[in-house]
Amino acid sequence: MFAARITSPKKIEIEDIETPTIKEGQCLIKLERWSVCGSDIRHAYGPVMPEEEYPMRHGGACHECAGTIVESKSDKFKVGQRVIVLPSQDGPGGLVEYYPGDESRMALVPDHGDLGEWILCQPSGTVLYSCQQMGTILGKDVVVMGQGSIGLSFTAIVARAGARRVIAVDPLDYRLEWGKKFGATHTINPDRDNVDEALAEITDGKLADIS
């Protein structure tokens, strides 16, 4: 199978390696969609960490991936089902053709819809967990700093959880426009406006309940 591998700083090569075999409690997943986490962008554009060793493991760095089960040794999943899988640290990363997924690190997604959209459930799950730690959001004013993928997930979830006002803050106008589509009631561009003053005006002086 094909697998991507970071062989030296900022260099990714495609290698042909053996397709993995699976153990009990695992499924072999033919991966079809991948998403690049912000924490992985640095491998192409950011600093090189001194503790990193090359070549890195096959499939790294990628931990947001989804596909269809082609072989199963799990009582919980069957061939043909579509899943999101979270790669573990003791196996390959997600930039591979086939991945041996542990059933405890897999989640079913519906048969309908594009996997490229369903895969966003993976980072959004982190956001959902964070929102659960906040307690009730109902009727509160919530400020979301940044409207990248994680920020937009926060905007969408708190808007649907009953927040009174969802205030998106980002220096990029196109991201603020997406914030509105995802549920922001107000937007602030910190390059143009003083954030504290804008918040005070929006919230009648009380600022935010949650930020």
Kindly label every feature range from the protein language model.
Residues H63-E64, V83-M145:
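NAD(P)H dinucleotide-binding glycine-rich loop of Rossmann-like/cofactor-binding domains
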Residues F2, Q26-L28, D141:
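Residues that mark the start of a beta-strand
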Residues S39-Y45:
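Cytochrome P450 core scaffold surrounding the K-helix E-X-X-R motif
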Residues P20-S35, V48-Q89, H112:
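Glycine-rich beta-strand-centered segment in the early N-terminal region that forms part
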Residues F2, E15, Q81, V96-E97:
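Extracytoplasmic/periplasmic beta-strand context in beta-sandwich domains
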Residues A4-I12:
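Extracellular beta-rich ligand/substrate-recognition surface
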Residues I202-I210:
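A glycine-rich helix->loop->beta "capping" turn
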Residues E117-R192, E197, I210:
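Mid-domain Rossmann-like dinucleotide-binding core that forms the NAD(H)/NADP(H) cofactor-binding site
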